Structure formats: structure tokens, C-alpha cells
């Protein structure tokens, strides 16, 4: 495929070719993707300098997946190369700070996923894991460093149990990630320390009221763990609430049934 767009502030035309290929071998599929993607810098950067160029990402993916009799597994390697990121630079003469499009970075890792709907009656479980290494030279970071939002290890397990007579599904989800990086002024380097690991145990119940009405309720972090999302002045940044509640009603107005209760 091919995409092009024109950005008026920078007066630049962006060309984004993309190629995807799949090879099927029985119940297995091999896939490869290479593509160029662009996006505008964030609004707060464009306000300071509207002439900033669109940020660029060259993405490469190689994956394999296997699907057989209710069991599905997938593994994917990826590499992303970033260019023209917004970067704060200082004029050598005036010492004025200004934004340029000279930032760059990369991200690489592996995604693993497994789902089993066949081993146990009325029960489905999922396992997922992501390993990621990300580096950026952008914004106020004048050397390659790990962004504040990037965590190296992310994992989750999900168990769903169906209650056909009650037309309901009960789910339990446990999410884990290694600590987010933050800058500790007592240590050398940038983004040189991590907060404690993240963990959240969530519960959910889905009720099929009719073929076109689904009611879903969930609550997160039932153990009320104090998860940290960074540090400012050596004080932990916490969520506004230890856990959240959600209740949603999904109604299909068309003739066809569009919602699949097993997706909740």
C-alpha cells in the first residue's frame, strides 16, 4: 500500500510506502511487514514551532502464528527506527532554547501470545509477554535514553469462565510490568533508575441480556496496590484512585449481532 499527505505548517509532502506479506503452511502463518509511518509532533511542540517536520517511523515486523482446534499462539519480532523527533537544542551564541526536528531513536523487542479454549470445558485462558528496549533522543533529553513511559517487561494472564445457564462470563486478569524509568539526580546519567514494578489484579463479569444487549461490569486493582507511574522531586507519582469501577451496556441497533460476548 502507499500513503501520502501534505503538512501545511512545514510545507512538506510525506510519502509512506508499506508492504505486508503472509505465507500459509497448514495451520501456521508466517508474516512480514515493512512500512514507513509519519505523524505530526504533539500540539505543545507545534505551538512553540509550527514549522517542525512530521516525525517518521520505519517499522519492521516478522511474525509466526499457529491456530489449531481452539489453541492459538503467536510470536512477533519488531524493530522501529524513529527520525525527525522534536528535540530541544540551545543556540551556542544566545543560549536560547529552540525546537528542531533533529531527534531520533529506536524500539525493538518481541511479543508472545498464547490462548487456549480447548483444554478445559467452559474455560479459556490467555498468556502474553512483551520484551521491549526503547531509546530516544528527543524533547529535553539530549542523549539516547529510555523514555519515561517505556517498560522493558510486560506480562499478563487472563482466565475466563463461562456460565451458560446464567448467560454470563466471569474473568480474572493479572497484569505485570517492570518499573518505569525516572531520572534520579543522585545517580549518574539520564533516566537512570526505576520505580517499583506494576501489578494489577482485575475482575470482570459479562451478562448476555439478549442477542443484542450485553452488560459488562469490571473493577481494577482489587488488591488496592499502590502502583507508581514515575517520580517527581523524589516523590512517587500515584494514580488518583487505587481502583476503578466500570459498568457498560452494549446495544446493537442493526439486524445483525455485532458483539461477541467472549471478547469481554
Regions found by a protein language model. Give the residues of each.
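Signature of Gram-negative outer-membrane beta-barrel scaffolds
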Residues: 1-25, 40-41
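Residues on the lipid-exposed face of transmembrane beta-strands in outer-membrane beta-barrel proteins
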Residues: 19-23, 62-66, 110-116, 127, ...
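C-terminal beta-signal and adjacent terminal beta-strands/loops
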Residues: 119, 176-183, 205-264
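Gram-negative outer-membrane beta-barrel transporters
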Residues: 79-81, 100-183, 223
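Transmembrane beta-barrel strands of outer-membrane/channel proteins
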Residues: 2-4, 21, 32-36, 64, ...
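Residues that define the transmembrane beta-barrel architecture of outer-membrane proteins
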Residues: 13-15, 56-60, 67-69, 104-110, ...
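Repeated loop/turn-to-beta-strand initiation elements of outer-membrane beta-barrel proteins
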Residues: 27-31, 70-74, 120-125, 165-170, ...
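Membrane-embedded beta-barrel scaffold of Gram-negative outer-membrane proteins
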Residues: 24-33, 54-115, 121-123
Amino acid at each position: 500500500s502507499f500513503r501520502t499527505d501534505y503538512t501545511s505548517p512545514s510545507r512538506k509532502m510525506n510519502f509512506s510506502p508499506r508492504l505486508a506479506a503472509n505465507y500459509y503452511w497448514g495451520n501456521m502463518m508466517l508474516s512480514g511487514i515493512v512500512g514507513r509511518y509519519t505523524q505530526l509532533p504533539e500540539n505543545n511542540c507545534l505551538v512553540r514551532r509550527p514549522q517542525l517536520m512530521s516525525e517518521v517511523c520505519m517499522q519492521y515486523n516478522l511474525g509466526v502464528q499457529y491456530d489449531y482446534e481452539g489453541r492459538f499462539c503467536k510470536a512477533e519480532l519488531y524493530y522501529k527506527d524513529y527520525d525527525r523527533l522534536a528535540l530541544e537544542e540551545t543556540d551556542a551564541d544566545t543560549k536560547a532554547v529552540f525546537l528542531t526536528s533533529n531527534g531520533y531513536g529506536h524500539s525493538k523487542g518481541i511479543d508472545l501470545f498464547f490462548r487456549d479454549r480447548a483444554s478445559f470445558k467452559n474455560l479459556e485462558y490467555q498468556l502474553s509477554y512483551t520484551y521491549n528496549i526503547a531509546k530516544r533522543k528527543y524533547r529535553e533529553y539530549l542523549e539516547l535514553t529510555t523514555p519515561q513511559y517505556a517498560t522493558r517487561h510486560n506480562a499478563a494472564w487472563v482466565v475466563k469462565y463461562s456460565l451458560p445457564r446464567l448467560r454470563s462470563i466471569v474473568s480474572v486478569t493479572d497484569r505485570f510490568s517492570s518499573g518505569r524509568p525516572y531520572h534520579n539526580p543522585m545517580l549518574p546519567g539520564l533516566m537512570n533508575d526505576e520505580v517499583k514494578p506494576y501489578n494489577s489484579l482485575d475482575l470482570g463479569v459479562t451478562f448476555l441480556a439478549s442477542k443484542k444487549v450485553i452488560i459488562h461490569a469490571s473493577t481494577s486493582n482489587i488488591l488496592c496496590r499502590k502502583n507508581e507511574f514515575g517520580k517527581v522531586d523524589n516523590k512517587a507519582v500515584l494514580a488518583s484512585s487505587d481502583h476503578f469501577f466500570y459498568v457498560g451496556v452494549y446495544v446493537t441497533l442493526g439486524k445483525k449481532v455485532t458483539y461477541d460476548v467472549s471478547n469481554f
